[in-house]
Amino acid sequence: MPAGLPGQASVAVRLSCDVPPDARHHEPRPGMTDHPDTGNGIGLTGRPPRAIPDPAPRSSHGPAKVIAMCNQKGGVGKTTSTINLGAALGEYGRRVLLVDMDPQGALSAGLGVPHYELDKTIHNVLVEPRVSIDDVLIHSRVKNMDLVPSNIDLSAAEIQLVNEVGREQTLARALYPVLDRYDYVLIDCQPSLGLLTVNGLACTDGVIIPTECEFFSLRGLALLTDTVDKVRDRLNPKLDISGILITRYDPRTVNSREVMARVVERFGDLVFDTVITRTVRFPETSVAGEPITTWAPKSAGALAYRALARELIDRFGM
């Protein structure tokens, strides 16, 4: 089980130095809360946000709840949310495993891992029976959070698996031996509805759908919910939508407010109270190779992902 990678620390240090020192760890603006409101106690979703206290520490760990972070539309903050939700869960004492199921390797890169240099990744786990999760596991620098990395090699997996018996359950079989070590497994699915994404959905307890507040996202949301229904009927009876996360929300625009209203009207309580607003902080964290919870721990983005973690723990009761 590799505890790190040659050159990883130096890459991370170099990336961190590329960002001006005064860009880090700004204090929050006066009046900033975990759930910004629009006045009269109404949150950005148009509903009064629930007050969820910090979760109690866990005396033991596992078996993990497996959650797919999924949206076939790219650029909705899916990978950013996977990293930062995982880091926030780790802050609350939950052990988290992140699984990068995107050949672009954005999740791995977002944690400062030079994924393009790796000899073994999730691709090897899926297509080589003798390679296990432990053979590719990386202990990240983030507290309580491990990573199963990916790179461009994964793009060949769909073709390599197409003739395999039980190909949709390949990831489930690989994850099963490690579930007792973790409280949450977050799978960062690629922005498509191909075999890799179906593998992610087929082994999960639920799916979180990050979606940005734009009208084009509404149609993608409908298509994805149809796919979830099909996977539930054919492959994974326990699959359900754990929540819909609104990202890149700008309360100043009519478009954002109208899309928010439509999503809440359609999906009701499935929409998380936590809303991720637009901020320059997230691109900075991608360059630094660390979550916003450590890069700018008092920023609005960090507070939001901690609030999301509390909501998720409350929904799953763990």
Swiss-Prot record:
Induction: Induced by albendazole and thiabendazole, which inhibit the GTPase activity of FtsZ and probably septum formation. Keywords: ATP-binding, Nucleotide-binding. CDD domains: ParAB_family. Disulfide bonds: none annotated. Transmembrane segments: none annotated. GO terms for cellular component: bacterial nucleoid; plasma membrane. ATP binds at residues 72-79. GO terms for molecular function: ATP binding. Residues 19-63 are annotated as: Disordered. It holds the Pfam family AAA_31. Disruption phenotype: Essential for growth. Residues 21-37 have a biased composition (Basic and acidic residues). The keyword Coiled coil does not apply. PANTHER family: COBYRINIC ACID AC-DIAMIDE SYNTHASE, P-LOOP CONTAINING NUCLEOSIDE TRIPHOSPHATE HYDROLASE. May play a role in septum formation. Belongs to the ParA family. This is Uncharacterized protein Rv1708.
